[in-house]
């Protein structure tokens, strides 16, 4: 059986997928990755997997505006008459389709942050499993969206806040899509993908799930969450969703390779002794490079959450290139 891994181009997402890919390889299945960056292709091949290079069919509107500015708006305006942008998009899609067809995959593990490509695989008749490499993004009335900064409590006020947080995502996303559609004369990312859905015979209005904290999702899709359920807030077991098992032996007694965690574990044990009922929330942020402004916003948000919830203890693990001075003055419960 040939399995295609179409993973979002970020190191953290790739690393999360390797655990699953290794299991399939051990069962003597063929595993093939597709990559858009040469650096990622090198990492994948170092792990012993096949990899093909595939360009993005379309860059995001924000990225195009960041690089081209007003020139991009002009290109979109002229494309209303020439259809240049639409034709270029569908040429990329045709190339993508030919490359995928040549592989003849029996199943695709598609990163949930690339969910709009589900339509293409639907057209080719290839079953898709969406891989969530971050906390599960499915709507649950008792679990806040990951990006909200809310901590669920068993109260009516908490449930109302959670509901409003989910509705805010839908409203903001629709307003943003409408804004880009008008600004870019319906030559925007979302409008072109909507046309792809129609071309592929994939019902757009019925399948699009607006209630997702990171990016638009696809309803009724099979989902594999690479985060064990124990690392998420308690929630109802979602249909068509499977949690990956924990890949860490919590009872192991091997020497700690990174001694910076020793101090953290000592502090956690001390807190548990002093307050046995204490709740500990673990937060993590992977390596950030070239997103200093965004990193600052995230750190300030985490700091505010800690200050609003003194009854919890927070552990924050960060990757490279983070400026942790944004947390100063550091809350006592962080």
Task: Identify the function of each model-found stretch.
Residues 1-14, 37:
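Nucleotide-activated donor-dependent transferases that construct or modify glycoconjugates
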Residues 14-24, 39-40:
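Short amphipathic alpha-helix
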Residues 33-78:
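Conserved nucleotide-sugar phosphate-binding/catalytic loop shared by glycosyltransferases and other
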Residues 65-118, 122, 168-215:
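Conserved nucleotide-sugar donor-binding subdomain of glycosyltransferases
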Residues 86-166, 225, 229-232:
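Conserved nucleotide-sugar donor-interacting segment of glycosyltransferase catalytic cores
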Residues 191-244, 250:
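Long, low-complexity segments enriched in small/aliphatic residues
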Residues 233-327:
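Conserved catalytic-core segment of nucleotide-activated headgroup transferases in glycan assembly
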Residues 332-334:
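Active-site donor-binding acidic/aromatic loop of nucleotide-activated sugar
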């Amino acid at each position: 059986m040939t399995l295609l891994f179409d993973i979002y181009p970020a190191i953290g997402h790739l690393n999360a997928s390797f655990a699953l890919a290794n299991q399939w390889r051990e069962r003597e299945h063929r595993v093939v990755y597709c990559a858009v960056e040469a650096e990622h292709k090198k990492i994948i091949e170092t792990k012993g997997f096949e990899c093909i290079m595939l360009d993005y069919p379309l860059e995001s509107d924000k990225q195009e505006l960041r690089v081209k500015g007003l020139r991009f708006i002009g290109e979109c305006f002229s494309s209303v008459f020439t259809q240049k942008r639409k034709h270029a998009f569908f040429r990329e899609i045709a190339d993508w389709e030919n490359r995928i067809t040549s592989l003849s995959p029996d199943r695709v593990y598609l990163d949930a942050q690339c969910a709009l490509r589900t339509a293409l695989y639907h057209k080719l008749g290839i079953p898709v499993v969406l891989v969530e490499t971050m906390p599960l993004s499915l709507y649950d009335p008792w679990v806040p969206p990951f990006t909200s900064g809310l901590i669920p409590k068993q109260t009516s006020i908490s449930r109302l806040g959670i509901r409003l947080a989910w509705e805010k995502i839908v409203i903001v996303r629709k307003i943003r899509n409408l804004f880009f559609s008008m600004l870019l004369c319906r030559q925007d990312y979302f409008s072109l993908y909507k046309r792809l859905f129609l071309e592929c015979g994939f019902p757009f209005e019925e399948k699009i799930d607006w209630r997702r904290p990171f990016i638009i999702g696809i309803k009724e899709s099979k989902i594999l969450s690479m985060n064990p359920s124990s690392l998420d807030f308690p929630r109802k077991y979602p249909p068509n969703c499977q949690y990956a098992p924990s890949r860490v032996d919590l009872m192991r007694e091997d020497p700690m390779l990174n001694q910076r965690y020793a101090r953290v574990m000592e502090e956690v044990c001390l807190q548990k002794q002093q307050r046995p009922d204490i709740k500990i929330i673990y937060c993590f942020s992977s390596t950030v490079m070239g997103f200093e402004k965004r990193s600052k916003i995230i750190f300030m948000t985490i700091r505010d959450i800690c200050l609003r919830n003194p009854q919890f203890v927070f552990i924050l693990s960060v990757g490279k290139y983070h400026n942790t001075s944004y947390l100063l003055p550091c809350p006592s419960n962080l």
